[in-house]
Structures are given as C-alpha cells and as structure tokens.
C-alpha cells in the first residue's frame, strides 16, 4: 500500500498503510515463524523495502533489532526448510536486501557464518532473488481484474507491485 500511495500520491492510502504497518509490529510475538511469507523475515523484508524506497525513515538496525534477535533464536544449523517462502532462502532474501541498504549490525557474525554454512551445505543457489521471483503471476490478464483475487500472490496486487518495482 505504501508503494501504491507513493506512486499515485494518495495521502489517504499512505495513512492507512501506516496504520497497518503499526498493527504488524504490534502483532509480533515470540513464537512467530521466521519465514518470509508469514513470519519475522517477511516483516523485516517489508520494513527494509519501505526504507530503501524512502517511504519510511528509520535506522533499520534500531527498528528491526527485536525481530532480528527473535530470528537468531533459531539455530541456523538446525533449519531444515530451505524454501523461499518459509525457510533459509527467504531468510537470505531478507538479509541480502538489508545489506543493500545499510550494514547489518543486529545479526552477530557467528549466526551469519552458520547461516552461510547451511546455505553451502544444502547447495542453495547463490544468485540473489527478487521478491517477484517468489510470487505467482496471476492466471488472468491484467485487463480482466474485476471479480478476481486481490492479493499480491496470484492476484490483482501482483500487477500493481510489478508496475511499481519496474
């Protein structure tokens, strides 16, 4: 919503996006999964993307410190899910984006080394991913959006995000 509000100069949408952003942070709890799609890495990724695009001003190391600490509670050597949506590759997508914005001070070097070892041990591709690589493209043409799913994954919002990020 922030990207949409910025692209179209919609202040009402920007205020609504801010309210939703705060609700996400209020909803963070200790037993959340670490994944990109429904977990802590996704919250971190979204926050980092907003900061990178200049839509929120913050120190990522300050605002994401608690989230990063909760992620580090999971031993990277014991992670078995290597997927983008809920596993190691999604965590790497988040960290790669973070490092592209500012030096990541909230993850300790040992954790990062153990995570890299997990990536190497499982022969995960080293190429950087883009969020669009993770999402499913809708099965309907962009012009036929009426009465279609609204979501970002396989829905109408996919086309909006794609046009904004290009």
Predicted regions and their residues:
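Terminal, non-catalytic domain-edge segments
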Residues: 66, 70, 88, 92-166
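Alpha-helical bundle segments that constitute or directly flank the non-heme di-iron/ferroxidase center
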Residues: 6
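Extended ligand-binding groove/face enriched in aromatic
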Residues: 15-106
